[in-house]
Amino acid sequence: MELYLDTANVDEIKEIASYGLVDGVTTNPSLIAKSGRSFKEVIKEICSIVSGPVSAEVLSTKFDGMMKEALELVEIAENVVIKVPLIPEGLKTVVELTKRNIPTNVTLCFSAPQALLAAKAGATFISPFIGRVDDTSWDGMELISEIREIYDNYGYDTRILAASIRGPIHLKESALRGADCATMPHSAFLQLFKHPLTDIGLEKFLEDSKKLKW
């Protein structure tokens, strides 16, 4: 399973990338706005830090605008993936970008029928928002299972990128239900390392190590 960071904070990306555990990065306009820097400047720097996919979202909601922005974004680096919202104009854009062999990430997916449409359009990635689905009292994990079954039934190559991951349980369940990859904020990524028994065990080892001669 591939693990992505959902952030535009360069320092956070550098930290996790230094462990050799991050496969890519996802961004959105809200995350980049927090940086106070220009959109393209941030994407270019992120692409220089990680070699894997970096999702950069178009700002327009119209086909012509999305295409113009997408073609500019892919010039930044070879690992840029064009992120588009799951709306009719967005999927029309995905169809055209797919014809040009430009990778895409369809975002804001909240239902299996939406995911089916994205796959038919040729999306490289589909991003179901697990945490936000849970917030509406629906089951975000069931959504992953439904998408996985549909894609397997019909042989779609679109990769399931579980998004809106809030912590280790979301990641574990996404992995068990067949998501190909997952993206999460820096804080959630750091939670993956932690377990109280690990801390207790390490404390005991360190205490015992004081009795040893190196």
UniProtKB/Swiss-Prot annotation:
Pathway(s) annotated for this protein in UniProt: Carbohydrate degradation; pentose phosphate pathway; D-glyceraldehyde 3-phosphate and beta-D-fructose 6-phosphate from D-ribose 5-phosphate and D-xylulose 5-phosphate (non-oxidative stage): step 2/3
Keywords: Cytoplasm, Pentose shunt, Schiff base, Transferase
UniProt-recorded Gene Ontology molecular function terms: aldehyde-lyase activity; transaldolase activity
Top-level division of the source organism's lineage: Bacteria
Matching InterPro entries: Aldolase_TIM, TAL/FSA, Transaldolase_3B, Transaldolase_3B/F6P_aldolase, Transaldolase_AS, TSA/FSA_arc/bac
Record: active site: 83
Family the UniProt entry places it in: Belongs to the transaldolase family. Type 3B subfamily.
Protein name: Probable transaldolase
